[in-house]
């Protein structure tokens, strides 16, 4: 019996909506990353983008467990000497919650062309309003 290899033109994409309110950031991000990769489908093929589109709402209400809000730092570098910028997650979530969630998911995806293609299928919104009503997204209940 031969192994099945998905072809890009045969992939059927669905739209899912996830409510991130009062759920841990890492748990939501890992499940969203898995759906973006297509690992929930029996037709998953590592070198083909078989994933679905995901809309995440209420990202400003996401939770970090323990003391991570104050102790964990979001870092980026300006590429100049001494250009390391660090801010605690409490400030980062208050200023730009969409970026914090997208970064968490991006770091869980492959770091190449395919990973960037997968990340384009992620739509993140602060609040419960989104403008993807026409796609008729299914509500996705997360496993944990």
Curated annotation (Swiss-Prot):
GO molecular function annotations of the record:
mRNA binding; structural constituent of ribosome
Q: Which UniProt keywords apply?
A: Ribonucleoprotein, Ribosomal protein
Which biological processes are named by the entry's GO terms?
Answer: negative regulation of translation; translation
* Top-level taxonomic group: Bacteria
Q: Does the keyword Ribosomal protein apply?
A: yes
Q: Which GO terms describe its cellular component?
A: cytosolic large ribosomal subunit
- Which residues does UniProt call coiled coil? none
Q: Which InterPro entries match?
A: Ribosomal_uL13, Ribosomal_uL13_bac-type, Ribosomal_uL13_CS, Ribosomal_uL13_sf
Family classification: Belongs to the universal ribosomal protein uL13 family.
Tell me how this protein assembles. Answer: Part of the 50S ribosomal subunit.
Cited function:
This protein is one of the early assembly proteins of the 50S ribosomal subunit, although it is not seen to bind rRNA by itself. It is important during the early stages of 50S assembly.
> What is the protein's name according to its record?
Large ribosomal subunit protein uL13
This protein's species is Clostridium botulinum (strain ATCC 19397 / Type A)
Name of the gene encoding the protein in the UniProt record:
rplM
């Amino acid at each position: 019996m031969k192994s099945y290899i998905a072809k890009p033109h045969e992939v059927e994409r669905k739209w899912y909506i996830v409510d991130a309110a009062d759920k841990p950031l890492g748990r939501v991000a890992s499940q969203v990353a898995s759906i973006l990769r297509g690992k929930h489908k029996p037709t998953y093929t590592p070198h083909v983008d078989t994933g679905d589109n995901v809309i995440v709402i209420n990202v400003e209400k996401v939770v970090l467990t323990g003391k991570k809000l104050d102790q964990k730092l979001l870092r980026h570098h300006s590429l100049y000497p001494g250009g390391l910028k660090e801010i605690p997650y409490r400030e980062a979530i208050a200023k730009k919650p969409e970026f914090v969630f997208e970064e968490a998911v991006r770091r869980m995806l492959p770091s190449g062309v395919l990973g960037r293609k997968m990340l384009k299928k992620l739509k993140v919104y602060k609040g419960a309003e989104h403008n993807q009503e026409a796609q008729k997204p299914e509500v996705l209940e997360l496993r944990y």
